[in-house]
Amino acid sequence: MDKTQRDLIIVSPYFVPGDEFTGYLVSLVDRGVRVRILTNSLQANDVSMVHAGYMRYRKDLVAGGVELFEFKADANKVVRKENRESGAETKEKRRIGASKASLHAKFFSFDETYLFIGSFNLDGRSVALNSELGAYYASPEEAKLLSQEFDEMILQIAYQLTLDESGDLQWTTERNGEELVFFKEPDTTWWKRFSTGFLSIIV
């Protein structure tokens, strides 16, 4: 990542950057690198403990200029709708979808030129405990297409986190062509928010 000059995309289902890596990502932005991150939203995350560990870093990332996105739990519905309208959907694709989705893809893209794809999550367990595999290779055409599709599709399948005038987080997305803004974790119960918030204090 140190050699990244223009653009960095991180897609990781479990994303717990820690203080040091959060500061590092913000430093990339400070030197002119566009940083985009996609991870699971609270509703889409199947491990509340991971989300609890991640949520404390969101404000610092967003305030530092990182473009932070959280995957919607109903993203599969959006993708299937797009496929139907474009005529691209097949019976096989229809069987793959589910009413509740969770992000599982794991990859990094550097300067729209290099890709890293593998089993590695950006959380403490992957870094310190798990044995992970990945492939790093140059593919400018694939990396550029990925970057373009990220921008084109992201607000349909994810929420973008920003800060409101009071410095609190807000979640922006598109639904049926309209922009929607949420001021708490979207599509979650008060208990889910409370319990995960409590976990964030102790993890």
How should these model regions be labeled?
Residues F15-V203:
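PLD/PLD-like phosphodiesterase catalytic module centered on the HKD motif
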Residues M1-D7:
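Secondary-structure "cap/kink" motif recognition
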Residues L8-S12:
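Short catalytic-loop micro-motif centered on adjacent basic/acidic residues
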